[in-house]
């Protein structure tokens, strides 16, 4: 039987693509803005 090779960690996921991390940079804010415009229920990983 094969092993699962991709096992993500919650801490890294939040640090890389959490809401507060996105808000720190201009491009990150653009990501949030685009997701708001599209009407996404979850704007980032750490929300919802």
Curated annotation (Swiss-Prot):
Membrane listed as a keyword: no
Pfam families, sorted: Ribosomal_L34
UniProt xrefs under InterPro entries: Ribosomal_bL34 (IPR000271)
Matches recorded under Gene3D superfamilies: 1.10.287.3980
Listed GO MF terms: structural constituent of ribosome
GO cellular component, one term: ribonucleoprotein complex
Keywords in alphabetical order: Ribonucleoprotein, Ribosomal protein
A single GO BP: translation
Membership in a protein family: Belongs to the bacterial ribosomal protein bL34 family.
HAMAP family assigned: Ribosomal_bL34 (MF_00391)
This protein's name: Large ribosomal subunit protein bL34
Organism: Gloeothece citriformis (strain PCC 7424) (Cyanothece sp. (strain PCC 7424))
High-level lineage: Bacteria, Bacillati, Cyanobacteriota, Cyanophyceae, Oscillatoriophycideae
Gene: rpmH
């Amino acid at each position: 039987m094969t092993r699962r090779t991709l096992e993500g960690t919650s801490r890294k996921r939040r640090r890389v693509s959490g809401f507060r991390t996105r808000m720190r940079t201009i491009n990150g804010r653009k990501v949030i803005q685009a997701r708001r415009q599209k009407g996404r229920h979850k704007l980032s990983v750490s929300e919802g």
